[in-house]
Amino acid sequence: PANEDGSYKFDKNALHIWPRGRFMMIALANEDGSFTCTLFMPHEGDKFAFDKLNSPESVNTFFKTVFPDFYEMVPTVAEAWDDHPLSNLAIIRCSPWTNGKVALMGDAAHATVPFYGQGMNAGFEDCTVLSNLMKKHDENWEAIFEEYSRERKPDGDALQDLSLDNYYVMRDYVSDPEFLLRKKIEAKFSELYPKKWLPLYSQVTFSNIRYSVAYQQGKKQSDIMDIIMQIPNIENVWDSETVMNEMKVLSKDFNF
């Protein structure tokens, strides 16, 4: 909930994450000063799972133990628990996307988990690609659908892979000091040489780079960062000229 004066308890312009390894909770700001919090966790089979939160006492114990700072802000969480039913996350991966006069678009073709926030954008991209192909092929719908499916299917698959990968980042890696150092190095190098390095998140979220291309470039960047992280004393020399020059050599094939 909001503060008594209606202000936000924490930064309204940030995604807030409580990473816990196998699960996590996130919070996003609402316009009234409150936050919508979502708990992503296995339904069953884990030490911490939804099937174990089956009473007000178990809910309170869980949040007191696992998210004590959240519980301090929302001590009434158990009272609201049953008003927020569980739902499932799913991926739809299918082929072909077209048949006769029918074409799948948006979630019908490539529904994905929400951890990159790109589901709607991907649907709009489908529309843009299809619109351009309609202009290219005029009324030849067979050619339109054939090229649409051939062009978009790899991007739909890549977005799903990216979204799943980012779930692991959010629930686990963001609390890993080595991972955070990798991101600091990437950000520093990208600031110095924006044409040689665009972080994967920026490729996906803030550019028109195809998801399939971003996914492959992200893999190459990860391999480069594995090499950089092996530099002796990297935690103390991460922003040095030596490290930046090594990054420049390793990223010579990139041109953003």
Give the predicted meaning of each segment.
Residues Y116-L133:
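A short alpha/beta connector and helix-capping loop motif
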Residues P1-P85, R93-C94, T98:
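Conserved FAD-binding catalytic core of PHBH/FMO-like flavoproteins
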Residues M105-D107, E125:
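Active-site flanking residues adjacent to catalytic metal/cofactor-binding acidic residues
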Residues P42-K47, H110-A111, N166:
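A short, flexible beta-alpha/helix-coil linker loop
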